[in-house]
Amino acid sequence: MNDLVIHGALIVDGSGSEPAIGDVAVRDGVITAVCQPGLTAAEVVDAEGLVLAPGIVDIHTHYDAQLTWDAGASPSPQMGVTTVVVGNCGFGLEIGRASCRERV
């Protein structure tokens, strides 16, 4: 059984195909089904009227210094960004910190 079903969202999958309204199932943190009818789960989230899309990778940021006090790189998560690239302007404090190497 799935842990979570996100029901009725407008699904934009990032492939370039037309968005479609449907359900997405998740089990153990992994997407197991997209747009299949009859999905069930322990928890169902009603996403009608909302858009569901993959996380965005921001390849040009200026978070280099900010990451030393704001590991969440806010406000990126509120805008759908799940991964940021730093150091692309020749300045990267975060990369040199031993405590941050797991995130690099």
Tell me what each language-model feature is.
Residues 13, 64, 91-94:
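Flexible loop/turn segments at secondary-structure boundaries
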Residues 51-75:
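Di-metal (Zn2+ and/or Mg2+/Mn2+) metal-binding site signature of metallo-dependent hydrolases
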Residues 69-103:
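Divalent-metal coordination cores built from histidine and acidic residues
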Residues 1-5, 10-55:
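Histidine-rich, glycine-flanked metal-binding segment
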Residues 15, 35, 65-67, 85:
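Activation segment
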